[in-house]
Regions:
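Hydrophobic, lipid-facing positions within transmembrane beta-strands of outer-membrane proteins
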Residues: 1-6, 22-26, 38-44, 71-75, ...
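Residue-level signature of outer-membrane beta-barrel architecture
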Residues: 6-10, 44, 48, 79, ...
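Repeated loop/turn-to-beta-strand initiation elements of outer-membrane beta-barrel proteins
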Residues: 12-18, 52-58, 84-88, 110-113, ...
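Transmembrane beta-barrel strands of outer-membrane/channel proteins
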Residues: 20-26, 58-62, 75, 89-93, ...
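Extracellular loop and loop/strand-boundary signature of outer-membrane beta-barrel proteins
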Residues: 26-32, 61-63, 88, 100, ...
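Outer-membrane beta-barrel translocator domains and adjoining extracellular loop/strand segments
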Residues: 30-37, 69-75, 125-132, 170-178
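Outer-membrane beta-barrel "beta-signal"
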Residues: 74-84, 146-156, 183-199
Length: 199
C-alpha cells in the first residue's frame, strides 16, 4: 500500500476552521496490477473552537475505491475534560474510515494511557495469478485499542499499542465487482509500537 496525503486548513471568521485532506492510495497484493489499484478521494470538514478546552467539528469523506464509491460522516472531537483527561480523535480520517474516538488519561509529565476504537474498511486488488484473478478483496473490522505512551523528553515519545479487531468480515469480489464470497473472521489480536522524535 502506498499513500499520499496533502492536508490543509483554512481558519475563518467566527472561530471556524475548514479542513481538506485529499488522498491518493494504491492498495494491492503482490502480483496484482498497481494501475488497477487506485483509491482516491478527500475528507472535507469544518470545526469550531467553543473554548480553549473544546473543539468540535463535522464533515464527510468521499472516496473512489477500486470500482466502488463510498461516503461516510466524519466527527471531529478535541475535548480536554480536565487537566488529565482528554477525549479526541486518535487517528486521521482517511480512505479506511473516520478518525474514531480515544479517551486518554495523563498520569504525569512522562506517562499517558488511553483506550479507543474506530471503524475500518480496506479494499485492495488481488493477485492476477491467484484464485480470483484481478479480483477485489475487502476487509472490515472494528479495532479496539489500548495505548501506553512514554515521553522520555519533551520532543520524543514512545507509543505501545495492544488491542483486538472485532466484527471482522472478509469479502471477495471478481474483477467486475460482483461478490463471490463473504465470511466473518474471529477477533484478531493487534500489537504495535511507534517512536517519534523531533530535532
Amino acid at each position: 500500500r502506498f499513500n499520499f496525503k496533502l492536508p490543509g486548513e483554512n481558519p475563518a471568521d467566527a472561530g471556524l476552521t475548514f479542513t481538506a485532506i485529499p488522498t491518493i492510495q494504491w492498495a494491492y497484493e503482490s502480483g496484482a496490477s498497481s494501475s488497477d489499484a487506485l483509491n482516491w478521494g478527500a475528507i472535507l470538514a469544518v470545526s469550531k473552537a467553543y473554548s480553549k478546552d473544546l473543539t468540535l467539528g463535522i464533515g464527510a469523506g468521499i472516496f473512489r475505491e477500486i470500482d466502488d464509491t463510498k461516503a461516510f460522516p466524519v466527527v471531529l472531537v478535541d475535548w480536554r475534560i480536565n487537566d488529565r483527561l482528554r477525549l479526541a480523535n486518535p487517528t486521521q480520517a482517511g480512505p479506511a474510515g473516520g478518525a474514531g474516538l480515544e479517551l486518554a488519561w495523563t498520569l504525569d509529565d512522562r506517562w499517558e494511557i488511553a483506550g479507543g476504537g474506530a471503524w475500518r474498511t480496506h479494499r485492495f486488488r488481488l493477485d492476477r495469478n491467484g484464485p480470483t484473478p484481478d479480483g477485489i478483496g475487502e476487509r472490515k473490522s472494528i479495532p479496539l485499542m489500548l495505548r501506553a505512551t512514554w515521553r522520555p523528553a519533551p520532543a520524543s515519545r514512545l507509543d505501545l499499542y495492544a488491542g483486538v479487531a472485532v466484527g471482522g468480515e472478509l469479502t471477495v469480489h471478481d474483477r467486475d465487482g460482483n461478490e463471490l464470497v463473504s465470511q466473518d473472521f474471529d477477533p484478531a489480536p493487534l500489537l504495535g509500537i511507534t517512536f517519534q522524535a523531533r530535532f
